Amino acid sequence: QEWMSSLMRPSSTLSAGAFFIGVWMAFLAIINILFGAYSDGRRVNWIDFFTNGADTNSAHDVTLVFPDDIVFILLSSLLIAAGAMGMGATREDGFRGWLSGMPRERVVTSTFSTENGLGRTFASWMIVAGAAYYLMWSTLESTWVDPGVYSVMISFVMVGIGLNWIQDAKLES
């Protein structure tokens, strides 16, 4: 029964992931409404895009498209809220404490110092490199939903996160 209760407790890792993915989705929704997130400034029709429908993109005009943009914004809001609530439940200082303490987290401070080891510095820079690649490519090419760019970006980011977790495991043992 103990293993069952551990599965039902909120996870700070899962909460942080939900929060960051929700923020990223909200960012994409704003880009899609203002400029179009698909290539050549076209807008993404989110429902068809995720279900592999026939009309994954359309000509851009600065308006909300119902239900696509509304559903995507609601989904991003739910992920942000779930992440904030989960983080609030897992930490004594709550969500605000986690958010305000983020600049002092080992992953962030290791981008500017080797104090926590060269492995963690390398891991942190992998995360930065992945995010920078995605932002630069998407800005220069005006396409924010390119699967090839995602695959390169997520490879860098997840290897960086994984290497940071390995460093955390070394500290615990």
Where are these regions (language model features)?
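Alpha-helical transmembrane segments and their membrane-interface junctions
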Residues: 30, 122-151
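Membrane-interface segments at the starts/ends of alpha-helical transmembrane spans
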Residues: 51-74
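Membrane-water interface of transmembrane alpha-helices
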Residues: 79-103
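Alpha-helical transmembrane segments and their immediate juxtamembrane interface regions
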Residues: 149-173
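Membrane-helix interface motif
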Residues: 29-53
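Alpha-helical transmembrane segments and their helix-start/interface "positive-inside/aromatic belt" motifs
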Residues: 5-26
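Select subsegments of transmembrane alpha-helices in polytopic membrane proteins
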Residues: 17-21, 117-127
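Membrane-interfacial, low-structure loops and terminal tails that flank and connect transmembrane helices
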Residues: 1, 94-118
